[in-house]
């Protein structure tokens, strides 16, 4: 990639720019994570919460930029998203005794994810929790109630708003050996294993570097086994509809294209892209996953930050896909050759 990148870029596939899907985290790597969640404890008392001990594992080649280099894994945004939602769901299921149908109809309204000050690279025996911050009645919500949770996995944090029914109110504490013991088999739940059973083709990519925008057409394919993913939180909605995970991972690939074009670098020469904050909001009716969906990304601000002897590119982003909107901020350290020619406000 030269530093005199064209203002307009048209690609038949995002792979033409970022490389094969099976070597990249946001296309395939996130689906290769394995989770072990143990010692799940629900305490509905004065400080209502659910706690657990979590270990994660990734294969060595979970993401590659150069043929001979395996990147070091850490707790990812997708990991935080799905683990925190399952902990929150476990609290609701235990405390309100939600039945199978009520769990399927419960819906995620909003997700806010924040990174820690350092990446969480220790993946064994992590402390994790979701704390209930409040429940309010809402006649527009599925089930008539909205509960807000804050959660953490290691140093990463999140906030969730979940629509649900509340047929009962149980005050007894609960102890479970695993999440499956509370929620049922992970293979039948989208936020358990189901999110791994979709893959995306991102085509007709159009990036306007001057305007800091990119669009694409996203085609989603369900992998064998997805037809059984009908249980748990968002089960009714995601059996056929697009998800917040779909919105995040597809738009992140467009963000990468814009970022690399902005400073004239290639993926193989780039440094790790760090998420600082992401907000995903359900804003409309479900978009059927079987139908192509339009993805749209726009940088709402961008600047340069001298830090630890290097130069970092920071951006804030607005994006959307299939009934979800996303606002987020990301940063990466520019390689030396790109930093020498980087253009923009420095703070």
Language-model features: where?
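Hydrophobic beta-strand-centered segment that forms part of the acyl-chain substrate-binding groove
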Residues: 88-133, 257-302
